[in-house]
């Protein structure tokens, strides 16, 4: 089951044309990521200031399907998934009412903050990822039963 984050588009999110500036949609997605961590019980202060471990974003992409304007009320739906022993990916869908207006992906790699070398994901992040994996699997099982 995706995590949902509600957000109002602010004037500061927009560019001279009055639409959301392309890079700001990633910041808005990151807000959703942070909210999902916080909701699962992860201390953001400890997570982002851990002197031994960091989770840099090594890939990001966005597809814009419709423009967003100041005052728009959006819902960010995100699903994180483990894609290796040391990395995970988050898929985001941004909705205005029931209309999909943008899609984004961020890929994160777990590194030792001192040596900058890859390391396995922390137990805390694995538990966060597993929570979404289990919820998603349960939703898929329910859908499969409905089809039968």
Swiss-Prot record:
Origin: domain of life: Bacteria
Enzyme class: hydrolase
Any one biological process term the GO annotation gives: phylloquinone biosynthetic process
Location of the active site: 15
InterPro entries documented for this protein: 4-hydroxybenzoyl-CoA_TE, DHNA_CoA_hydrolase, HotDog_dom_sf
Family that this chain belongs to: Belongs to the 4-hydroxybenzoyl-CoA thioesterase family. DHNA-CoA hydrolase subfamily.
PANTHER family: 4-HYDROXYBENZOYL-COA THIOESTERASE FAMILY MEMBER (PTHR31793), ACYL-COA THIOESTER HYDROLASE YBGC (PTHR31793:SF37)
Protein name per Swiss-Prot or TrEMBL: 1,4-dihydroxy-2-naphthoyl-CoA hydrolase
Taxon lineage: Bacteria, Bacillati, Cyanobacteriota, Cyanophyceae, Nostocales
